[in-house]
Curated annotation (Swiss-Prot):
Encoding gene per record: pbpB
Task performed by this protein: Penicillin-binding proteins (PBPs) function in the late steps of murein biosynthesis. PBP-2B is required for vegetative cell division and sporulation septation. Beta-lactams inactivate the PBPs by acylating an essential serine residue in the active site of these proteins, thereby interrupting normal cell wall synthesis. This protein itself, but not its transpeptidase activity, is required for cell division.
UniProt name for this protein: Penicillin-binding protein 2B
Subcellular location: Cell membrane
MF GO annotations: penicillin binding; serine-type D-Ala-D-Ala carboxypeptidase activity
Membrane topology label: Single-pass membrane protein
Length: 713
């Protein structure tokens, strides 16, 4: 018995010691925490604060891209995703249910707004899930649709806010502007191409946050001290692009692309006095809303090719500047041997017999320019002028992807060929920059597209571009002489530019027919050329300089190589000059009916009848949206520029009836849909030829209107 007690006492002692050690460890731990305020390396006060701190995002917007007059080219727009909560556990108060209670009623109500039948919606709501979405019909919900659904007060129906990049003009300088898209990893919009990518550091937004103290349920405490990190909206970028002039260019390119199906079209409109690019476009192009891209390059700056006879402008200018061009001196046209090889005139080397250099320019004689280079200027001086006109270097335009030229000036035949636009490859933008010297009295201007950048939060201009001279290769008197003879290229019966006459305005310019280099030589065939025209107007004091190039158009019998080029140049130049209110050299009856710029009157708060009358008095075409008696909204807004006979939209409220959109442009159709708050799907290019909803039929809330476009034959 005593032996047993001995072992029991020893066990009790060991157990007591263990408890004592455990007690002292706990006591020490508590003392450590009490003194240091830390546990497991973390400050407990901070940890406790974090558990009761919540963060709420203050969303910022990506900067907009605008034209020179502030019209939107690219902007963020809010969209919404429709979701339905099916989990009954989300409802904590039966008086305020947070899940879908009546699926039949919910399906019936939603079917009136989104493009899904009641049965399809009901199938989705009957799924075994806590939360469901509605596929493509529930994405990109407009604010107007969201408001309609919210007014229905459907339990369990909610929205997730989203943002997408929107390009209201569709195909519009797309290879210049580029596009931005959502990064799937960060869920942020980032530039992926063009100016959207290059200027991403300016356009990029930074969300802000509000940090606040909350209770256990997450609700903000009444006396919470909020910490605010302010959001930073992206900067707004204003371009030199003019929306109206760009539209003139886009519309004419679309017609030519449809009619002649060329491999490429490249065109730009520039103010030669400043170097501002007012319009720039190409075909093929794409709609940045759809991102149906086939060519990621901006061909005006990224495509170097043998320019053809437009290069003769600068050889002529060099010869005139050096006083070696004698207009009345005669030479033998047809063929001329250089470096052991024949230079041939474009009529198969037949020529026009002995002719003057003056007429050689008008006829675009290769022999005339080869002889000017070899016998009058000399190759060294010609090369000096190639340097003066900056053909050996990039222009430095503020766009990504500009490539270098390739001037072949080693062999004699290449030297002579460069004088008339073969052998050496240059970019369209290099030719345009050089031509500003001709249009701007000898002073060459560097082209640019970014005008200024504004911080919208501070309403402060953080970058301001300005015109920059790229040199003075010729004198003002030489520039005038060149313009005069280029004017004759257009007006003379022997001139190659007769197709580019514009009634009321004197045009100076030069045609180009460039051979396309292939494997082992130039491509054969009558269509395998790049046809172009470099033109300026008015001739005596040019306000606009336009370059157009059309590569490999499919010409039919009876069609001329100048047809596709002139069908872009002429309407773009004429409409732009009228839009800019440039006085015609000679006024004609037809000029009175041409496009004129004017100011949009304020038609809001007027009766429909009064607003329509006022619009018609201003030579505008009013389109009424709604059935109420008074105008509540209008597009364009008051004091914005409008053109003669332009459609203007007057929104009244009430029931909306479908208009006849036949002949409307894509832009007009999309503007109508945006103001009316209806969903319109467009397909094709050109002008509206059909619509899915008949004229005068009432447009229901969920109606999707499909409009097809086609270019006129």
């Amino acid at each position: 018995m005593p032996k047993k007690n001995k072992f029991m006492n020893r066990g009790a002692a060991i157990l007591s010691i263990c408890f004592a050690l455990f007690f002292f460890v706990i006591l020490g731990r508590m003392a450590y925490i009490q003194i240091t305020g830390k546990a497991n390396g973390e400050v407990l006060a901070t940890k406790a604060t974090e558990q009761h701190e919540k963060k709420r995002t203050i969303e910022a917007s990506r900067g907009s891209i605008l034209d020179r007059k502030g019209k939107v080219i690219a902007e963020d727009t809010a969209t919404y995703k429709l979701i339905a909560i099916l989990d009954k556990k989300m409802t904590t108060d039966v008086k305020h249910p947070q899940h879908v209670v009546n699926k039949e009623k919910t399906a019936e109500a939603l079917s009136k707004v989104i493009n899904l039948d009641k049965a399809d919606i009901l199938d989705i709501l009957n799924k075994d899930a806590k939360q469901v979405e509605f596929g493509s019909a529930g994405r990109d919900i407009t604010y107007s649709q969201k408001q309609k659904i919210e007014k229905m007060k459907l339990p369990g129906i909610s929205f997730l806010r989203d943002t997408k990049r929107y390009y209201p003009n569709g195909v519009f300088a797309s290879n210049l502007i580029g596009y931005a898209e959502v990064d799937e990893e960060t869920n942020e919009i980032s530039g992926a191409m063009g100016l959207e990518k290059v200027l991403d550091k300016y356009l990029k937004e930074r969300d802000g946050y509000v940090t606040y103290e909350s209770d256990k349920s997450g609700w903000e405490l009444p006396n919470s001290k909020n910490k605010i990190t302010a959001p930073k909206n992206g900067d707004n970028v204003y371009l030199t692009i003019d929306q109206k002039i760009q539209t003139f260019l886009e519309d004419s390119m679309t017609k030519v692309a449809q009619k002649y199906n060329p491999k490429k079209i490249m065109a730009a409109v520039v103010d030669p006095k400043t170097g501002k690019v007012l319009a720039m476009g190409q075909r093929p192009s794409f709609d940045p809303n759809k991102r149906d891209v086939t060519n990621y390059y901006n061909d005006l700056i990224s495509y170097a090719y043998e320019p053809g006879s437009t290069m003769k402008i600068f050889t002529l200018a060099a010869a005139m500047q050096e006083n070696v061009f004698n207009a009345n001196e005669k030479y033998k046209s047809g063929t001329f041997e250089v470096g052991g090889a024949p230079v041939k005139d474009h009529n198969n080397g037949v020529g026009w017999g002995p002719t003057t250099y003056h007429d050689g320019v008008l006829r675009s004689s290769n022999v005339a320019f080869a002889k000017l280079a070899k016998e009058k200027l000399g190759y060294d001086r010609l090369n000096q002028y190639l340097h003066k006109f900056n053909f050996y270097q990039k222009t430095g335009i503020d766009l990504p992807g500009e490539v270098s030229s390739k001037i072949n000036f080693k062999y004699e035949f290449d030297k002579a060929s460069t004088a008339y636009g073969q052998a050496s490859a240059v970019t369209p933008i290099q030719q345009i920059q050089a031509a500003t010297a001709i249009a701007n009295d000898g002073k060459m201007m560097k082209p640019y597209v970014i005008d200024h950048i504004v911080d919208p939060d501070k309403d402060k201009t953080i970058y301001q571009n300005k015109p920059e001279s790229a040199g003075t290769p010729i004198s003002a008197s030489t520039a005038k002489k060149v313009r005069d003879i280029l004017g004759e290229v257009v007006t003379s019966k022997i001139g190659t530019g007769q197709a580019y006459k514009i009634e009321g305005f004197d045009v100076a310019g030069k045609t180009g027919t460039a051979q396309i280099a292939g494997k082992g030589g130039y491509l054969d065939g009558t269509d395998n050329y790049i046809f172009s025209f470099m033109g300026m107007a008015p001739k005596d004091d040019p306000e606009l300089l336009i370059y157009v190039a059309v590569q490999q158009p499919q010409l039919k019998a009876g069609q001329s190589s100048s047809d596709p080029v002139s069908e872009i140049f002429n309407p773009t130049m004429k409409n732009s000059l009228h839009y800019l209110n440039i006085e015609p050299t000679e006024k004609s009856d037809s000029d009175k009916e041409e496009t004129k710029a004017q100011t949009m009157p304020d038609l809001t708060d007027q009766t429909v009848a009064a607003a329509q009358k006022k619009a018609k008095e201003e030579n505008l075409t009013p389109i009424v949206i709604g059935s109420d008696v008074a105008v509540k909204e209008q597009y364009p807004k008051a004091d914005e520029e409008v053109l003669t006979n332009q459609k203007v939209f007057l929104k009244t409220g009430g029931k909306i009836k479908m208009p006849d959109m036949t002949g409307w442009s894509r832009r007009e159709v999309l503007q109508y849909g945006e103001l009316a708050g209806i969903h319109i799907e467009v397909s094709g290019q050109g002008y509206a030829v059909s619509q899915s909803v008949k004229k005068d039929k009432e447009i229901k809330d969920k109606t999707v209107i499909k409009v097809k476009f086609k270019n006129p034959d």
